[in-house]
């Protein structure tokens, strides 16, 4: 079992606080609000390579493995305390069942897990072979056995140019945010926030920052609607963009499931939306959507690790209030070099989404000077 340095958690978090405070110092940021993580079982998704060991017996054995970042050597993982308890239970349960069936275990090279606080889990089995009807029958029987053992599980098989979904390729998460509960459909192989407890804290912080806002909200990179659905209560209307089709479909479901009636999602990238707003080119996807009907005084961005491109930074700068969540404080600070010319940081936060690593999730709330 991989041991976590739980006794060092506070020390590691304090070091992150020092680093982020130093990064934000040139921008006169106020003191950080710090949101610690649970010290174990905080990660809702995990992926492992599979090792077939034929040295132990004729049937061979099957193990989850990971690779040491320094030596690149593989090591066996029977329990993974970083991951949710549900993932750990599934890890221990599924391998013996897979091993019983050659059609399920042969050429299986990776298992991905996606779990929820609502106790649902997707298990994706990745193969170096074509998946047949025989595989599908065996996988269906495996699913029944796991359900009989108390798991609310979906099983997906993947191979080159193949995806076999036995029932559905999503789970429905329930998050408690303040005094409200939100339902979020999460699709296999699409982005979701990995640390559910910290996601709830990020949503609460974002809601608190934008309380008593005037006008409308624009969100770029909305994913499955994680933030825009929770923030919609603070605005007259919300316009959100997302490029990935599965995420857009999940967002539309989530809008209906949470009975949000003031949120419109458009399938386009942040870069395309910038072109549309600036009149550089027209998009069929915007037919029927009157951008002039929105009075967006606030913009929310949660970009990929690369941060915002220069054109999008200029677009963001046009708004009076900017809420920026970043998974890479280095690129956040690069963007702040420009944004700080017109805006000041009113609030700053550190969300410890990734304990025991150097990765930091930061949030800043900016107002026009």
Swiss-Prot record:
Protein name: tRNA/tmRNA (uracil-C(5))-methyltransferase
Gene3D superfamilies for this protein: 2.40.50.1070, Vaccinia Virus protein VP39 (3.40.50.150)
Species of provenance: Actinobacillus succinogenes (strain ATCC 55618 / DSM 22257 / CCUG 43843 / 130Z)
Root EC class: transferase
Annotated binding of S-adenosyl-L-methionine, by residue: 193, 221, 226, 242, 302
Domain of life: Bacteria
Matches recorded under NCBIfam families: trmA_only (TIGR02143)
GO function term, MF aspect, one: rRNA binding
Signal peptide: none
